[in-house]
């Protein structure tokens, strides 16, 4: 595994692709103080189990921050050049923003504007949802479109981009 880039890193993949595990290994190998920003909400028992599984897998040595909406705010609060921050995941953040009827363009612009200011190393995890069929309902299509746009703008600003499938990372940029 290579050393962690100074610029943002984006790790994309499908559900259960191994993207979170790969990202955690990348962060753990960095030698920086590890922070984890969880954007998911425990809406039900199944989601609580997923969150618990991720927390158990990470083990000790991580400081966890739960922030479903104010991603830039939490990143600013924990920004330090000795930190590496794993944000898992952007697609759950998009879901939360949509459910709260936030201005997606403004939220995405705020995140992208923050990236050059960040002193901590940032590793973003996100689900690639644009590889399947066109969703049949409007909300699902809007979600797919928002996620796709966010991935493109974060990838453009990232030093490294990976796509993970079957637990195997493919380096796409950097």
From Swiss-Prot:
**MF terms in GO:** adenosylcobinamide kinase activity; ATP binding; cobinamide phosphate guanylyltransferase activity; GTP binding
Q: Which UniProt keywords apply?
A: ATP-binding, Cobalamin biosynthesis, GTP-binding, Kinase, Nucleotide-binding, Transferase
Which InterPro entries does the UniProt record give? CobU/CobP (IPR003203), P-loop_NTPase (IPR027417)
Gene Ontology biological process terms, A to Z: cobalamin biosynthetic process
Catalytic activity field: adenosylcob(III)inamide + GTP = adenosylcob(III)inamide phosphate + GDP + H(+); adenosylcob(III)inamide + ATP = adenosylcob(III)inamide phosphate + ADP + H(+); adenosylcob(III)inamide phosphate + GTP + H(+) = adenosylcob(III)inamide-GDP + diphosphate
Q: Which NCBIfam families match?
A: PRK05800.1
**Which intervals of the chain form a coiled coil?**
none
Q: Where does GTP bind?
A: 13-20, 38-40, 55-58, 66, 88
- EC class (word): transferase
Gene3D superfamilies linked: P-loop containing nucleotide triphosphate hydrolases (3.40.50.300)
Report what the protein is called: Bifunctional adenosylcobalamin biosynthesis protein CobP
The active-site annotation reads 54
Quaternary structure note: Homodimer.
User: What family is it from?
Assistant: Belongs to the CobU/CobP family.
The protein's job, in short, is: Catalyzes ATP-dependent phosphorylation of adenosylcobinamide and addition of GMP to adenosylcobinamide phosphate.
Q: PANTHER family from the entry?
A: BIFUNCTIONAL ADENOSYLCOBALAMIN BIOSYNTHESIS PROTEIN COBU, PTHR34848
Pathway terms, separated by semicolons? Cofactor biosynthesis; adenosylcobalamin biosynthesis; adenosylcobalamin from cob(II)yrinate a,c-diamide: step 5/7; Cofactor biosynthesis; adenosylcobalamin biosynthesis; adenosylcobalamin from cob(II)yrinate a,c-diamide: step 6/7
Q: What organism does the record attribute this protein to?
A: Sinorhizobium sp
EC numbers, comma separated: 2.7.1.156, 2.7.7.62
Looking at the record's lineage, which domain of life comes first? Bacteria
